[in-house]
Regions:
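Beta-solenoid repeat scaffold
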Residues: 69, 80-114, 126-130
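Feature marking well-ordered beta-strand scaffolds used for ligand recognition
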Residues: 108-557
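Right-handed parallel beta-helix/beta-solenoid
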Residues: 24-59, 76
Length: 950
């Protein structure tokens, strides 16, 4: 029987749930929230409810979310194994003891929690965390001490950076591995902003230079890292942001005909702060990046995805501009929102999903087979399908018409705990789905489910893969017949998906060697789409790893092009050679497809197709690319051709993308500098890259000599690099070449120095432009870098209260003093106590309903460079939640209604509103509204509710 008050809550709930929306706080259950442990507790659920804590430290560690804090009440607790001891002493998960427990509440740290099973050498460290250590024999004896000390030492080493190491005998240095080499570790100490944790990673190949870049999210911003030499990564720049545990990144690259060059933008969403969507202009690469002034219409979102893009370069796959698919924003229920990139610097909202279902992550497929006509609603020459992973189901949408998305199907599955993300196979017939909570909720080993999408309107589960540990699978991406998974505590996992329904483990690199449990630690993201074959991995706890996958070395052979570039005149054909190397076992095949760069579909007649080899045949195959003579003088145009979907067990080698350059008939070849003036500094990137480009024609051989012919910088003292030599292009090679100079930091204050490089003795080509380039080198203080504005996290406060805006965390990379300017952007006008101080305050206005105010902080350095950041303050009619901006949308809920709902949901869910049994409730009700506020404290106070057991 349901008690009367609970029944009333159910009735109120039924009538008011439309005001409540599930937001990104539900997206990673337990992430960034305190966990509670107390003697007499029960090890079940996620330890999020202080009224119903867990019993053991080990259990709490196993379910801790990203950025979690574990609060331990007074009492005695055993540290059962070296892994738990490591997590306590290393600080990778914040653990605090000594909380006084009064009734069902954890009060401030006033007492002592006693730990047993801990060696005495950790006593002083743990004392500062509120613990008393009892050094019993169990804690002193055996391999436990040695193992814990080894883990602590390894953690310190990893923070400083791990050396490159091939995978030999199951080890790559200190990491367990299988067929994956460690090329480089770009640790937190290598990042100029000194972050403490990493989030997601994406990447792209800059078509101006063919240099490769990883874009890495961190807790305090986003870095662009040059990984062209994967053994020596270098940070190009860092864009500061508000502190947050979640950042997601995608890229769009396009050719600007007015400037005759490629331009690229990175799009960064942040959850847990009010940064909204950052747009980073990367068109200044290889030397600089900058954040644009774009202001998004949302202030928080969990994920971003760029539809209709090639994952290696970020260029559009069709003649339509890509859409940004925003997942889990603070607007409405966090459902899909589409933004056109018609103006890449200013994404503009087009339309969103018609349903109110929170979308956590997304992927998309361009369908060109018969399904586009029989199964899509809006298809024309193609159908663009969006895969919507929305916590409870996998939804498939037709977004071919961006302004009118149509849902084609909704697919649940057994043991669904949290439908998180997924990717598609290159035959476009299967998707691989990640559930982020099934390992915890159902005690499963790592599980990836495989669905057939032969019928887009009725996907069917056809298989699954289970790992050897319970580590959580996070995200995955397909390249050929390899599936690369960021496997949290297990690091990088590589699957062979030759048979998509039966994936097989073929590679791994354990970037988190401390445990393989179900905690949210270790590898967050991975990116396997670089032309070079480098695979990037972002690890929450230790930063960026660059790896090489050797699982592609198989007896069936590897497919690759025999050159990175080919060329032909309009009206003729280009012949491309595809090789099978490393083995010839079995019957195999590989597909190929065109990706338009500057050569549009009307410039060639290449159709996608398949090449086949019988067993024992290792001969070459040819792809004929007819080039159309359109009669227009267009300059040298570029087409990309990609090998895809290998079958029979053969794999894609590193060179699976090539360029075909289309010459105007009779055009003459020229060689010149991409930019004739570049600027760099002795610090920071400390590298000068001069890009040489070939234009006009790429059909014959060409070469040119270069030499340092002037400038005030001295070779060997001020810079290192070749001071003279010859750069050559083979026949058909139209790809850019790079001259690289490493700049030395001499220290002290000196004038700007220069390097002058001249071109001469061109063979097979003329010299374009002046044939001279100048590098300007700023002294040890570096080029003046724009400051970083940090306006603080969003706040929720009650009306008529004092609100403090704190911008004191703003900083200048050059150490310059800053000036401050606070401005109110939106909302009822208030009076700021100061507009020119780092910290200002105001009194929240009287409001009739919950109202959001937005403020902008602009900081400027003495040279005039500036940066801006915004923050929000939501003013409520009642008591403020003080949640610091959890990313939830505005709500107008009577306090007593919210109070009753919180209380009832906690009772129904066994003191945990996030238990899987009650997903039907939490799909409509935001459990995060019940935490960290007066509502929570009252809802947990039994004296206010005489509710008997139901």
């Amino acid at each position: 029987m349901i008690p009367l008050l609970r029944l009333a809550a159910l009735t109120i709930f039924a009538g008011t749930f439309t005001f409540l929306s599930p937001q990104s706080a539900e997206a990673h259950r337990g992430a960034g929230e305190p966990l509670f442990v107390a003697a007499g507790g029960v090890d079940q659920g996620r330890c999020l409810d202080e009224a119903s804590p867990c019993r053991s430290l080990g259990y709490a560690l196993s379910v801790a979310g990203k950025g979690a804090e574990i609060r331990i009440a007074e009492g005695t607790y055993e540290v059962g194994n070296p892994e738990d001891l490591f997590h306590v002493v290393s600080g990778m998960i914040q653990v605090s003891g000594g909380f006084e427990r009064r009734g069902k509440r954890f009060l401030e740290r006033r007492g002592i929690s006693t730990l047993t099973g801990v060696p005495p050498q950790f006593r002083e460290l743990l004392k500062g965390k509120g613990f008393n250590v009892v050094s019993d024999r169990k804690g002193i004896d055996g391999p436990k001490v040695a193992e814990a000390e080894k883990l602590v030492a390894l953690h310190s080493q990893m923070k400083a950076g791990m050396p490159a190491s091939p995978c030999t005998g199951g080890k790559a240095g200190e990491f367990d591995c299988q067929a994956v080499d460690l090329l480089a570790h770009f640790s937190f100490t290598d990042v100029s902003a000194s972050p403490e944790s990493a989030t997601d990673v994406w990447g792209f190949v800059d078509l101006n230079s063919r240099r490769e870049y990883a874009i890495v999210g961190y807790d305090i911003g986003t870095a662009v890292v040059d990984v062209t030499d994967p053994e020596n990564p270098l940070e190009v720049g860092f864009i500061d942001g508000q502190p947050a545990f979640w950042r997601d990144i995608k890229v769009y690259q396009f050719f600007d005909t007015n400037d005759d060059r490629w331009k690229a933008y990175a799009y960064v969403t942040t959850d847990g702060s009010t940064d909204g969507l950052f747009v980073i202009d990367m068109s200044g690469l290889p030397h600089a990046i900058q954040k644009t002034t774009y202001v998004s219409d949302f202030f928080a979102a969990h994920n971003v995805y760029a539809t209709n893009t090639d994952y290696s370069t970020g260029i559009a796959l069709t003649n339509e501009p890509p859409l940004l698919a925003i997942s889990g924003s603070n607007i409405s229920s966090g459902q899909y929102r589409g933004y056109t990139l018609q103006d890449p610097a200013a994404p503009a909202f087009v339309a969103g999903a018609s349903s109110a279902d929170y979308m956590h992550d997304a992927s998309s497929i361009i369908i060109t087979d018969a399904r586009k006509d029989s199964q899509c609603d809006n298809a024309a020459a193609w159908c663009e399908v969006l895969l919507d992973f929305n916590e409870l189901t996998i939804d498939v949408w037709d977004i071919t018409n961006p302004s009118s998305p149509a849902r084609l199907s909704r697919t649940p599955y057994a043991n669904a705990a949290y439908v998180h993300s997924g990717w598609w196979s290159e035959d476009k017939q299967h998707i691989f789905v990640h559930d982020e909570q099934d390992e915890q909720d159902f005690s499963l080993n790592t599980t990836v489910r495989v669905f057939s999408v032969a019928d887009l309107r009725a996907p069917v589960m056809v298989g699954e893969w289970s790992g050897t540990t319970r580590a959580i699978d996070h995200n995955g991406f397909v390249r050929g017949n390899r599936y690369y998974i960021s496997n949290y505590a297990k690091g990088l996992t590589v699957l062979d998906i030759t048979d998509p329904a039966e994936p097989v483990t073929v590679g791994s690199l354990d970037t988190y060697p401390f445990s393989d449990n179900t905690a949210f630690v270790g590898a967050w993201g991975t990116y396997p789409f670089f032309f070079s074959g480098t695979v990037a991995v972002s690890d929450i706890d230790t930063g960026l790893y660059l790896t090489r996958d050797r699982s592609i070395e198989v007896p069936q052979g590897r497919f690759s092009f025999d050159a990175a570039s080919y060329a032909g005149d309009e009206g003729q054909s280009a012949l491309i050679t595809v090789r099978r190397t490393g083995g010839s076992s079995g019957n195999v095949s590989v597909g190929f497809e065109a990706v338009a760069a500057t050569a549009a579909n009307g410039d060639h007649q290449l159709q996608s197709g398949t090449l086949e080899w019988p067993a024992g045949d290792a001969g070459d195959r040819l792809i004929n690319v007819p080039l159309v003579n359109d009669g227009n003088a267009e300059g040298l145009e570029q087409l990309l051709v990609r090998l895809v979907n290998p079958t029979g067990g053969a794999t894609l080698d590193q060179l699976n993308v090539t360029s075909v350059y289309v010459n105007d008939p009779g055009a003459l070849a020229e060689v010149g500098f991409f930019e004739e003036s570049v600027a760099t500094a002795e610090r920071g990137f400390a590298t000068a890259v001069l890009v040489l480009q070939r234009s006009g024609s790429a059909t014959g051989e060409a070469s040119i000599d270069f030499a340092v012919t002037g400038g005030s910088a001295s070779p060997g003292t001020d810079f290192d690099g070749e001071t003279s030599g010859t750069v050559a292009w083979a026949a058909g090679d139209g790809n850019p070449k790079n001259l690289v100079f490493n700049i030395a930091d001499e220290g002290g204050d000196e004038d700007t120095e220069t390097i002058e490089v001249s071109l001469s003795n061109a063979l097979g080509a003329g010299i374009r432009g002046a044939g001279t380039a100048t590098v300007e080198i700023a002294n040890g203080s570096g080029l003046n870098t724009a400051p970083n504005a940090i306006a603080g996290s969003g706040q929720t406060v009650a009306q008529n209260n004092v609100v403090v805006l704190n911008g004191s965390q703003s900083n200048d990379p050059d150490g310059d003093s800053l000036t401050y300017l606070w401005e109110q952007v939106s909302g009822p006008q208030v009076g700021l106590s100061s507009t020119s101080s780092p910290v200002t305050e105001f009194t929240s206005p009287t409001v009739s309903s919950d109202t959001m105010l937005q403020f902008r902080l602009t900081v400027s350095d003495p040279s005039g460079l500036s940066d801006s950041a915004t923050t929000t303050v939501t003013v409520t009619t009642g008591a403020g939640s003080g949640d610091g901006g959890s990313g939830g949308g505005s709500t107008s809920i009577p306090f007593i209604v919210l109070l009753v709902l919180c209380r009832s949901l906690r009772r129904l869910a066994g003191h945990d509103t996030r238990e899987p049994l009650h997903k039907s409730w939490t799909a409509y009700f935001r459990p995060d509204l019940c935490r960290g506020s007066l509502v929570e404290r009252m809802a947990l106070d039994d004296r206010l509710f005489a509710i008997g057991p139901g």
